[in-house]
Amino acid sequence: MLIPSKLSRPVRLDHTVVRERLLAKLSGANNFRLALITSPAGYGKTTLISQWAAGKNDIGWYSLDEGDNQQERFASYLIAAVQQATNGHCAICETMAQKRQYASLTSLFAQLFIELAEWHSPLYLVIDDYHLITNPVIHESMRFFIRHQPENLTLVVLSRNLPQLGIANLRVRDQLLEIGSQQLAFTHQEAKQFFDCRLSSPIEAAESSRICDDVSGWATALQLIALSARQNTHSAHKSARRLAGINASHLSDYLVDEVLDNVDLATRHFLLKSAILRSMNDALITRVTGEENGQMRLEEIERQGLFLQRMDDTGEWFCYHPLFGNFLRQRCQWELAAELPEIHRAAAESWMAQGFPSEAIHHALAAGDALMLRDILLNHAWSLFNHSELSLLEESLKALPWDSLLENPQLVLLQAWLMQSQHRYGEVNTLLARAEHEIKDIREGTMHAEFNALRAQVAINDGNPDEAERLAKLALEELPPGWFYSRIVATSVLGEVLHCKGELTRSLALMQQTEQMARQHDVWHYALWSLIQQSEILFAQGFLQTAWETQEKAFQLINEQHLEQLPMHEFLVRIRAQLLWAWARLDEAEASARSGIEVLSSYQPQQQLQCLAMLIQCSLARGDLDNARSQLNRLENLLGNGKYHSDWISNANKVRVIYWQMTGDKAAAANWLRHTAKPEFANNHFLQGQWRNIARAQILLGEFEPAEIVLEELNENARSLRLMSDLNRNLLLLNQLYWQAGRKSDAQRVLLDALKLANRTGFISHFVIEGEAMAQQLRQLIQLNTLPELEQHRAQRILREINQHHRHKFAHFDENFVERLLNHPEVPELIRTSPLTQREWQVLGLIYSGYSNEQIAGELEVAATTIKTHIRNLYQKLGVAHRQAAVQHAQKLLKMMGYGV
């Protein structure tokens, strides 16, 4: 829950001076990106902006305290303030902030600006007491905010010092409105107005001006002088002389003498006790001070002018002026040291009663009350964990003695999940092992099962599927049906283990079960994970259309639950890119991979390895080797500076080896082959992929026999495990081996198998990537005219893709080629005497490339009847009677010109 007072603009008080000259300056605030109000404490920053904000509707107010250095808390309140200003316009951002479903503050702000693009009215966001922010991540995020905020949004920041928000750049670009302490200082006229409002007997203008000069227009000093004069302890001028030259850091003695010592003991204790509250209402005051009618007491303190501020329009919430509040808290530590723990305990209890456990934890920590802290955590820790209050939980758990954790194993489990969320896998197992060693009877029952579920998740994350399987099974055997979260975890892990072992049908069933349980209990990140795993399994089985449909369900879940900024979103768009690439939708595949990189923009560059490999695959499929080389340089740099899972390495190696194949770089392939990992098994898609990389390198090096052994074993495994997509890939590589080894009939046999299997997988780019060798074979198959209709159609599509992206055979019949051909001494006399037109040469090239008449018409964007005319003319000029003879004639010309065909 959010504390309402932190989102309420302060109420404009009676007897305050309206700062007309400053309000006039602020009237143009909508022309600036940032309005910055800076001064030491007590110069009236908040009062000024509350006057300016009066009557404005499109304004959000966020009052900071020390706890707002937690990024998640800062995000929640800031988005809530924007929602306040826009009447709930930014619903997606609000949900993301509430559920902590964003990768970083900057990515959350980026989503905010997308939603605000449809908000066209002027909009203001006030952040008060920004000097309390010390978290550099928040500073950096707010710099991003200011750089990218919409033109109709003005950010208003109040701070005691110059914040780290790129002020100089804004100033140079005239996008900054500044008001500092010199402008905030009261003028003679304002001081006179102030005293006239506060004192029953007016003072002379000259006297008022001298007092104002003595304290340099400092508003707090003027307020203290008025308070002293009302209490008749000193004349106003005497108080002014005493305050002259001092500042906020030297006020303590003065405040003791002039404020605390001039109120009765009951009021003094009320002030000291209530000051421990960062914000307060009737219930909190009654519980903390022990006085009845807390609201009435607060209003009385306000009337006495004791630096109390209303925080909302209802008058329910109050807080002390920061300067006075800090002073009172220091005095409380000195004067009520013995009572202070009990006061904090009372505050914690009252905050708990009002449903604010995070505020209660703050006071339990201050009280040093481990028992209270333990009880709060036992009741609310998992809710705080699910809302990503990780820093607060970590601080709280560190404050508990180890014995207290042992007595409450749920808290040990919580601490372990905290470590897991931070990828501290080794520490998780150490902590759980220590707890099991020291907690009696923990090695059986529900808690042990929950430990095992977490251990199973750690094991699979750490690349240990056998241990993960053992632990997940133990957990599922021991967990009661109602322990849904740990059951979801264990079921998911077991499904992932079976995926790794190639038991795809069983794995798919478990992932579907995980999805069902996760949806039932609103555990959305596991629901998304299970859908991604289902898609991968279906892809591996060769059911790419069903994999696509499963991905659509995952995208829908992301949109409905606002999961766009979870790292898992990158996983989803990456496997979508792989599917699009397989179907030769290269532009879409590239866009999808780039969106994955964008999701990970706030993470370490190493996390982008897989998407970068996908971009390289797109370049390779297009035959764009220059771009591929540039991207490969970055990929190889990332490989050398990180630790990766085996499937990540396999995907990275794949594009490297294909590039070496395309460029004939045998030295690089040989060097890689000497050092690369050779897995013990090949029972899943990423191990199959690594062995396929090895076989491709061996083929490039002419090591056909060992490559054939590898590929035959891969095919045996793929058939037995129904890894149909891998089988399709293996057949294509085996085809290349046979072709290069001169075993043309074997090459044709496995190519026919690959084409038939592609009717199920839909593969296109896997054929295209093999380039000219594939094009030659497909042309021959098409010319034989024996392919079934589906395979014939696919072969023609693959040829078109090869021709488009790799500039193969028909590209040789361009103007430069024809000119060189006609000047060749061995050119047939018939072509010299009756030369083809440029269009007829193009048609000949497309006939040679395997295109049908309809496809040639589509490629050249002319009518089919026109193509028939061109074909009739070129047959006559070449002296041939049919298509097969034209293909053979073109082949002779290419050989004559030195092209290996």
From Swiss-Prot:
Superkingdom as given in the UniProt entry: Bacteria
GO biological process, one term: positive regulation of DNA-templated transcription
Stated family: Belongs to the MalT family.
Residues annotated to bind ATP: 39-46
Cysteine-cysteine disulfides: none
Key word ATP-binding present: yes
Alphabetized NCBIfam families for the sequence: PRK04841.1
Protein name, as recorded: HTH-type transcriptional regulator MalT
Native source organism of the sequence: Escherichia coli (strain 55989 / EAEC)
InterPro entries per record: P-loop_NTPase, Sig_transdc_resp-reg_C-effctor, TPR-like_helical_dom_sf, TPR_MalT, Tscrpt_reg_HTH_MalT, Tscrpt_reg_LuxR_C, WH-like_DNA-bd_sf
Keywords tagged on the record: Activator, ATP-binding, Carbohydrate metabolism, DNA-binding, Nucleotide-binding, Transcription, Transcription regulation
GO terms assigned for molecular function: ATP binding; DNA binding; DNA-binding transcription factor activity
DNA-binding region: 853-872
Function: Positively regulates the transcription of the maltose regulon whose gene products are responsible for uptake and catabolism of malto-oligosaccharides. Specifically binds to the promoter region of its target genes, recognizing a short DNA motif called the MalT box.
Signal peptide coordinates: none
Complexes and interactors: Monomer in solution. Oligomerizes to an active state in the presence of the positive effectors ATP and maltotriose.
CDD domains associated with the record: LuxR_C_like
Classification via PANTHER family: DNA-BINDING TRANSCRIPTIONAL ACTIVATOR DEVR_DOSR
Regulation: Activated by ATP and maltotriose, which are both required for DNA binding.
HTH luxR-type domain ranges (all copies): 829-894
Keyword ATP-binding belongs to the record: yes
SMART domains: HTH_LUXR
